[in-house]
Each structure stands twice: as C-alpha cells, then as structure tokens.
A protein has these predicted regions:
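Hydrophobic, proline/glycine-rich low-complexity stretches
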Residues: 1-27
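Histidine- and acidic-residue-rich, metal-dependent catalytic cores
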Residues: 81-114
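Divalent metal-dependent phosphate-bond-processing catalytic cores, especially two-metal-ion Mg2+/Mn2+ enzymes
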Residues: 3-11, 32, 36-39, 47-56, ...
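Hydrophobic/aromatic-lined pockets within catalytic cores
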Residues: 69-70, 74, 89-90, 134
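Active-site metal-coordination segments of metallo-dependent hydrolases
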Residues: 33-45, 71-83
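His-Asp-centered metal-binding catalytic motifs of divalent-metal-dependent phosphohydrolases/nucleases
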Residues: 48, 57-74, 81, 99-107
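Short, well-structured alpha-helical segments
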Residues: 19-28, 42, 61, 96-107
Length: 205
C-alpha cells in the first residue's frame, strides 16, 4: 500500500516528508483500536482493494485512501473525509486544482468545481466498483466480510439488521449489474450475485 501511495503522491510532486507523514497518519487512522471499523479498516478493506488500485490513476488512488478516513456506519462522513483531504492538500501545497476538485467530487463534495473533468463518472464508477469488489470474494472471505460487517452494526438488533441487510441485498440483485464498469462486470458479477444469494438464504434460514 505504501508503494501505491508514494506513486500517487510523486505524480503530484508532494514533498517526501508530507507523503510519509500522511501515509502513517492514514494507516494509523484506519487501524484505530478500539473502534467500530471491523471491516472498513486498513487490514481488511484496504488490503482487498490493493490489487485493484495498482493500475488506477493517481487521483483515484488518493481518493481511495481518504474515502473511509472517517467512518461511521450510522451517518455519512463525506464532509469529514473531504476536510481531511483538504488538510492534506494544504500540507502538500497541491497545485493541480483540477485533480483536487476531482478527488473532492469522488469523496462526495458535490459543490467542488468539475467543469473541465469530463471523465468524472468513469472515475466514480471505478471507485465504487473497487469498493464493492469484496462482494465477489471467495466464499470463505465473503463469510468473514459478513461477520465483520454485522459487528459494525452492533447497535442494531439481529432482527433489525437482518431486515436492513436483506433489503440492501435484494436491491442490489434487482438491478441489471452490481458493477458499473465492463471489466468488473465480466470478472466479478457472477461471483458477487452467488455470494449475495447465499447470504440471503443464510439470513432467511
């Protein structure tokens, strides 16, 4: 992961000390203990994403690092994540405003100027597909993901969680494609649907 981060930061000419300090800061933040990050953390989520980020553009890689900088399963955290990225930009003296605004948009800031970036939708779709790639994991890894995700909603009763989770899964299965990009559709769509159907059967069992 460090090599990915360094490569992205080098693209934007981020000073080496800033690159290193923010890598440490993000890794620590996503590894906090105790926390409710049972899945959305450094050792689980980020490791699953690593291989899929290898060939992504630098802006998308940086967005992936800040996407869950702050995480709360109860309420949205886009504003806090954008604020953390803005702080990084100040430290890095990031001069590429177009890429900065693209990353802000990817992190959920709908007010960020993006008139010049015609590929925003493609970038957003790829970031989302990478986020959902866990759905196509091996049966064993998917079951572990389900267990960790349940722990993140420990504030909910089993009955309420099952109702919520069933609704999410059934909604995903009702749309033509779970993944938006053609590559992910070809490689992961079938496995993701099989895993989700198995989870539905388990929840109903």
């Amino acid at each position: 992961m460090e090599e990915l981060w360094q490569k992205a930061c080098n693209h934007f000419a981020v000073p080496e000390d800033v690159t290193k300090s923010w890598y440490t800061r993000i890794k620590h933040r996503l590894s906090e203990s105790p926390s409710k990050r049972y899945y959305h953390n450094w050792n689980e989520m980020m490791q699953h994403k690593q291989v899929h980020l290898q060939h992504c553009k630098p802006a998308l890689i940086i967005a992936a690092f800040f996407q869950y900088y702050t995480y709360d399963g109860v309420q949205p955290c886009a504003k806090a994540n954008c604020a953390a990225f803005e702080e990084f930009c100040c430290d890095a003296v990031l001069a590429d405003l177009e890429s900065k605004n693209l990353i802000l948009r990817l992190l959920g800031d709908e007010l960020a100027e993006n008139e010049l970036h015609i590929n925003f939708e493609d970038d957003a779709n790829l970031l989302q597909d990478i986020d959902l790639v866990i759905l196509a994991a091996s049966s064993e890894d998917y079951k572990r993901y389900c267990q960790l995700l349940r722990q993140e909603y420990e504030h909910m009763s089993d009955a309420d969680y099952k109702t919520m989770r069933l609704k999410v899964l059934q909604t995903l299965l009702s749309i033509p494609n779970v993944y938006t990009t053609s590559e992910f559709q070809k490689r992961y769509e079938a496995a993701a649907r099989t895993n989700m159907k198995d989870e539905i059967n388990s929840l109903k069992g």
